[in-house]
């Protein structure tokens, strides 16, 4: 099972939030989510936690693709524009540095018009254990 299938099956939090990995290769990972009424905050725009969940799933796919368990240890999110109900969002994660122990990534979350919604940077820690397969 590849990382896309594995995380789409086992990351229940992301799945329950409507997030799904659509693409993973050596250099990037993409996750997508359509904003629903369940994602909206009191201002009637997509809640920041939903945006972070989408970005975090793309980060997880990129950092864990070689089967070595990697957890996030630091993340920063900058909100640039609002996402509204019905928007299809795409989070594309790329490596800044694919260090063997502490990789760092950046993620751009965009809407269907390729407008930047938020920018995320993150660092992970690769443990010396295999990624669980269930």
Give the predicted meaning of each segment.
Residues 1-134:
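Terminal targeting signals and extreme-terminal segments of soluble enzymes
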């Amino acid at each position: 099972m590849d990382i896309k299938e594995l995380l789409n099956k086992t990351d229940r939090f992301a799945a329950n939030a409507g997030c799904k990995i659509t693409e993973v290769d050596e250099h990037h990972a993409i996750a997508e989510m359509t904003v629903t009424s369940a994602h909206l905050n009191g201002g009637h725009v997509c809640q920041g936690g939903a945006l972070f969940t989408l970005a975090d799933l793309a980060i997880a796919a990129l950092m864990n693709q070689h089967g070595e368990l990697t957890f996030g240890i630091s993340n920063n999110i900058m909100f640039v524009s609002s996402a509204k109900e019905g928007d299809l969002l795409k989070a594309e994660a790329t490596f800044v540095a694919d260090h063997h122990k502490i990789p760092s990534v950046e993620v751009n979350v965009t809407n269907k018009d390729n407008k930047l919604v938020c920018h995320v940077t993150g660092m992970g820690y690769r443990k010396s254990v295999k990624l669980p397969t269930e």
